[in-house]
Amino acid sequence: MESEKDCVFCKIAAGEIPSQKVYEDDRVLAFKDLHPVAKVHVLVIPKKHYRDVWEVAAADPDLLAHIVEVAQGIARKEYNGSYRLVFNTGLDAGQTVFHAHAHVLTGERMAE
C-alpha cells in the first residue's frame, strides 16, 4: 500500500501528474480514467487523502455527499443522468489505488 506521499491520486490532485480534468473545486477533482471500462468513466476523488470511502464517511460525511453530487452532475452532463457509481473498497474488492475515489460509469447496461 502506498503512503500518502507516494499516492498517485494525491499527486494528481496537487497538479504534479497531469490528468484530463472534468470537474474541480476546492474539495474534489474529477478526471477521466486512464483505462476506461465504460463509454464514460470518470473518477471523482477528494483532494484530501482518505484511504477509502469508509474513512471519508467517518471523517467528513458532507464531503462524501459532495462526491456523490459531483458524480451525478457529471452523469447528467455526459449521459443524460443514467449512471453507475462504484466505490471499490479494499484489495479483494478491486481497489488498486488506496485513495478514496468514486467511479462514474455510463453508456452500457450491465449484463444480466
Question: Model segments located where?
Answer:
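HIT superfamily nucleotide-processing domains
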Residues: 1-112
